[in-house]
A protein has these predicted regions:
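...with weaker cross-activation on analogous glycine-rich loops/strands in unrelated enzymes
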Residues: 40-41, 62-136
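N-terminal capping segments
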Residues: 15-66, 111-112
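N-terminal Sec-pathway targeting helices
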Residues: 1-12
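Compositionally biased non-globular segments, especially hydrophobic aliphatic-rich helices
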Residues: 11-14, 19, 71, 154
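Low-complexity, Gly/Ser/Thr/Pro-rich intrinsically disordered linker/tail segments
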Residues: 143-156
Length: 156
């Protein structure tokens, strides 16, 4: 089982690297959050990764579809840096990636692949408009990411 997980991680990096190598892009937070706000629903459709990926793409990020919890490997590849959760103050465009909750059965589609969402400046949105950052009742490990502007990702 470990070897399958390891191979999956390698495949993610190779595919993500293929699509993002030498990609110079600027991420437009306003376009991404507007897209997500307009398309976010009132109830979950269990497609958080799809909706968040489409918002990232609307903002100019060369995002690909992945299971939600695997975005923790992808976000650093596309110029998003991890932000410490201690003393965290959300900013528009921030992305949160939740691990799969322990004990979650593969038979339940909800949460099996983790969860990913973006902050639009007012609330967290994935495939639905969330009441708080975490969609889970129990405490689940998560990572926060913020787009970093650098000379490398500015188009000339």
């Amino acid at each position: 089982m470990r070897s399958i997980k390891r191979l999956a991680k390698i495949a993610i990096f190779l595919v993500a690297g293929f699509f993002t190598w030498s990609q110079c892009y600027t991420f437009d937070v306003k376009k991404a959050t507007t897209h997500l706000t307009e398309h976010g629903r009132n109830k979950s459709t269990h497609c958080c990764a799809w909706y968040t990926m489409r918002a990232l793409q609307a903002g100019g990020c060369p995002a690909i579809i992945l299971p939600a919890q695997w975005y923790k490997y992808f976000m650093p590849l596309v110029q998003f840096e991890e932000v410490a959760s201690e003393g965290y103050s959300p900013q528009a465009g921030d992305v949160v990636v939740f691990e799969r909750p322990k004990g979650r059965s593969w038979k339940k589609i909800s949460g099996w692949w983790g969860h990913v969402a973006m902050y639009n400046g007012e609330q967290w949105i994935s495939d639905f408009k969330q009441k708080r950052m975490s969609p889970y009742r129990q405490k689940v490990p998560y990572r926060l990411y913020r787009y970093r502007v650098s000379a490398k990702n500015i188009k000339t």
